[in-house]
Amino acid sequence: MRTTHIEDRDNNSLENKHTDHIEGVENGKGTQEPPSPSGFGGHLIDENLVHVEGEDKVTWYLCFLISASAIAGFLFGYDTGVVGVALPLVGTDLGGNELNSSQQEIITAGTTIGAIFGSAILGGWGDHLGRKMAILISDVFFTVGAVIIASSYSVPQIIVGRIVLGVGVGGAAVIAPLFITETAPTAVRGRCIGVNAFFIPFGQLVADSIGAGVQNMHGGWRLLFALGAVPSLIQLLLFHYLPESPRILIVKGDIDRARNVFQRIYPTATHEMVDYKLRVAQEYVAATTALQSGTTFWERVKKVWKTGSYRRSIIAVSVLQAAGQLCGFNTLLYYAGTLFGLLGLSNPALGGLIPAGTNAVFVLIGMSTVDKIGRRGLLLVGVPVLLLGLVWNIIGFYYMCKPTGGFLDTSYSYDTTNVGIVIGGIVFYVAGFGLTYSHLVWYQAEYLALEVRSMGSGVATTVCWIANLVVSVSYLSELETMTPSGTYGFYLGLSVIAFVFVVFCFPETKQLSIDETSLLFENDWGVKRSVQMRKERHETRKRFKDVELAEAATAHFEARQQKSASVSPAELSKFMAGLKGGKRKPQVLV
């Protein structure tokens, strides 16, 4: 059998140019002067041209790897969503008195405070610990925090438990999407990261569903918090069978284990093509890890800030994280029970299913289209929907609350039509959030070079939690001072500013490999360069494909001629049309 692969020829031609450098990496020694990404004719080896059999398919092993990793997303969602339905059930169980609004805000903010430390510490040390160990440490904090909260009999104890839990939430929020980004094949990377992103609203939906079912159960809030320990224990068990990120293994010089991981991710690929994939990863690792050689942590931080490409990429993902919080969506999660109770629903916890369910549905839609429409494409389509939803809420709350002076009054029975209009606005608003920020903020690792990927993810996620803290501790107070319309008007203003940033400063990563995306910010914010790189990639692959088809046709007709079979021009045209239409494969039996 003769199979024509332009990718094979392209990389064979590259092999001799890079032998010395690659051998240095394989020996775990690296090189004294790693080449810059532009040192190889302007580019390193293009991963998109190293095509592996079955690369665009999700295998059972990849499903297991992604699902086990995404449990961290479920824990993130469950433990941030559960507080909104659990706190109204506490009653007088914590000190004999009902929780006031200040205590609710502090308890809610406890997880956010812990998450700030968790994302900063585990994100900053993610390269040294490894992705796998960082996730396992997060699971320990998840489990211990859940036990402390479920056994609480005082407000200080539950706050401590929420802070401990928050460390796990923050660490998982950084490391899980980072781990998935570094292990998933380029062709399906968007969907794989999307699974973790979907598990976040799915966890919130599960928390709301269980909360609705334990409304009349004595101590039901304890059960809600205790159940959070179950997924973390499951992930602790499953991660025993999962590998370390192959790129971290390469950094540590463990090339054999990295090769084994690639072989399991691409089970139908030949050893030769797996080695090509490994070589691509080694080239980028060697070219992008010079920052970590012989410098202290603070020296690296200083260098990161002074290097324009690093600084711009971290700012870009940090702004997107902040935008996902400052649009106000998480107020619907944290205070769902309180808000829908004020709206007059008899079962506030059941009302919390509305934003959680809507979010989950539209995250599914977003993650299923992200590799086609793109990250930036979804933002440009979905954020305007979110903005219109905020305008809808502003108008809806204004007219609904007119009889009570613009403020929400728990003792007043609001007109059901106006309540329905507000709920409709919330659904529309959440739909826009689900299509965009709910999952796209967790693609942050795609935009960061390997040497700053863990640190940058930690910074961006820390920004996320700081913004979350600001919103969560001020929401109830804002409702009481600024009115609901004023509160959502404030969120609208911040969201418009964020959207302007997205339009001018947030590039597309669709069709680019995880190692190529870090090159976008070399000279500017990369919006135009992203378009140019993807256009060049498309044209290059098209040229290679045309050459491949022509060679396949030539081989076919050479075989026919050897059998003394005549070939007409019409038959040649028909054969080429079949190749281009995908009806024939570019391989020939001779």
From Swiss-Prot:
Basic and acidic residues bias: start-end ranges: 1-26
GO biological process, one term: myo-inositol transport
GO molecular function: transmembrane transporter activity
Key words, A-Z: Cell membrane, Glycoprotein, Membrane, Transmembrane, Transmembrane helix, Transport
PROSITE patterns tied to this protein: MFS, SUGAR_TRANSPORT_2
Segments on the Extracellular face: 79-105, 154-157, 214-222, 347-349, 398-420, 477-485
Induction trigger: Induced during sexual reproduction. Expressed during infection.
Protein's UniProt name: Myo-inositol transporter 3
Organism of this sequence: Cryptococcus neoformans var. grubii serotype A (strain H99 / ATCC 208821 / CBS 10515 / FGSC 9487)
Gene name, Swiss-Prot/TrEMBL: ITR3
